[in-house]
Amino acid sequence: MHFSRRHLTLITQLIIVGITSSCSLNNVKQDNSLKNFFDDNKVDGCFAMFDNVRAEFTIYNIQRDTARFLPASTFKIMNSLIAMQTGRVVDDSTVIKWDGITRKNANWNQDLTVGQAFKFSSVPHFQEIARRIGRDTMQMWLDSVKYGNMKIGTHIDSFWLDNSLKISPDEQLGLMKKLYFDQLPFQKRVMQVVRNMMIQEDNANYRLSYKTGWGFNEQGHSIGWMVGWIEESRHPYFFVLNIETPDTDADIVSIRKNILTGILTQMGFFKGKM
């Protein structure tokens, strides 16, 4: 088993801060049985989970887990945190006006609150939020959080989509853990609002929270993301799913959800017994 010391940020972080005395690379399990979920959907990819109670990692495709990709709309998490922290928006109820340009996604063609824009993953509304934040402020917070390669590039309103900014699945996993436990350099109120915006399913057995992302790399391949956590019995399990395909007709929205649901089901989730 080979691990890149430079990139295994969450694993290294946990060892350094000593979440448990038993936390070590021995707590990392490579689960190649998860390959079937990617093969069945004809995509490449990786999956990683951190069980916070046991301080254990489960990872499929460790090489990809430590490689960096454009964050696409998963960056809406950071964009929201920075905007609320700096007062560019007050909270998830702040209304962002529609720019009047009609787009294919009908949900985007209207005024939206920050919460609605997050739910609909509206690119133009969050581009406006990024412009309000501005380059210098945005860069300061990327540096403070050490978000991926921390590069904004030429355009303040598209750097998370044009492959200027890149982040690894492992780094995304670390970000999710820090967000959940109020360990990011933002006000607790701000982090709570963003956590609430991420809730997708909430019932007696589990609560599933995540943000999706979909963009294109330099080769024109689709890159899909799902980053977040699932809670059962008040215990969080952090996860990151990353997929890639050169097939321009691939239904990334369905594929990433099918893979995540399949993996979590195989692991025993959704029954409230974890």
Predicted feature locations:
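Active-site SXXK
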Residues: R68-D92, A117, F239
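Mid-domain, small-residue-enriched loop/turn segments at the edges of structured enzyme/sensor domains
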Residues: A106, T113, F126-K177, F181
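Bacterial N-terminal signal peptides that target proteins for export
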Residues: M1-T12
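C-terminal motif of bacterial Sec signal peptides marking the signal peptidase cleavage site
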Residues: S21-S22
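Short N-terminal helix-loop-first-beta-strand/juxtamembrane motif that initiates sensory/input modules
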Residues: D40-D51
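Short, well-structured active-site flanking segments
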Residues: Q85-G100, F186-M191
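Structured C-terminal helix/loop/strand segments within mature extracytoplasmic catalytic/sensor domains
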Residues: L25-F37, N41, R68, R132-G134, ...
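Short, conserved catalytic-motif segment at the N-terminal edge
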Residues: N52-T66
